[in-house]
Amino acid sequence: MKNIINLDQGVIGALEFFSKNKLPKLNLDQFTFPIVVGSGNAYNTGQILFSGRKAIVADESTFKKTIENYRDLINKKIIKEAIIISASGEKDSIWEIELAKKYKLKTILLTCSPDSSSAKIADEMIIYPKVSEPYTYNISTYLGMVLSATSENPKLILNFLKKLKIKNGFKSYNSYSLILPDEFIAITPMIDIKKSELFGPKLSLRAFSFGHARHAKFVIRDKKELVITLGKEKNMYFGEPQSRWQIDLPNKVDFAFILCLTYYLVGQIQKNKPAYFKNNIKNYCQDYGPKAYGHNKSFDIIVPGSINN
């Protein structure tokens, strides 16, 4: 699968794309107290978008229970909207919209797929452009949504990444940990998902906020684990001293910056290790991946981008 890029290349491509293509503006103030639902990193994107706001965030495993638990607030019109986040507009997002409608909630779909099954039944849509990417990557899909809310400049992020000097001996480590400023904790599960997608059981990749890192995450130290810390708070305790890398950040950064930086670093790991993802993604997309959803049709190994991509 030589045509499959690594994650870091996908980040650069997405930032270059958004530097040239306009995004819709996501005005979060229009939502007073929504239920936000998404699967995988769509769920984590919901956590990012509504961090610091009144919202209930659920995923495909918790949505049925969540919406029932808040039935009284829905009936009282305190909760009036369900925001469904789905890049593809397929899979779980279809029944999630149908369920929200049964509860008389207004459904707003955030998607990159205007012709999808969910797009046909949602009350409203916000459509995002995207680039072609390997299946599961979803860099441009969710990055576009985050940028539309934070209004960060993709060119500034791109310049930072292109100037970043990778630590000497980076590829010699056999495990990696990322420590993020506490305010960006919502990104840590996104890294964990990328670990599962790209490396499975083959490599250790962990991500914590500073606050979580203090809770016995580094009881066991190993000089072969590189601990990468982002931000001005110095890592004085986590990992072996000779196996730490501190990356200072600009004074003002937001979620899109941290998402791009962490994904870029994961891509650096990916390109320096065996091609676990590239060697397995074809079989996943053509066999057991779609079968888990009860589908016979294969997934696209390269998910097409927008028409203007």
Where on the chain are the PLM-derived regions?
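Short amphipathic alpha-helical segments and helix-helix/interface helices
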Residues: 94-98, 166-167, 192
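Glycine-rich phosphate-binding loops that contact phosphosugars or nucleotide phosphates
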Residues: 32-161, 229-248
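A short, well-structured juxtamembrane/interface segment
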Residues: 14-30, 158-172
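Internal, active-site/partner-interface "lid" segment
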Residues: 147-172, 278-306
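Cofactor-/ligand-binding subdomain signature composed of acidic, glycine-rich
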Residues: 1-22, 281, 307-308
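Anionic-ligand anchoring segments at beta-strand to alpha-helix junctions in alpha/beta enzyme folds, i.e.
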Residues: 25-78, 170-215
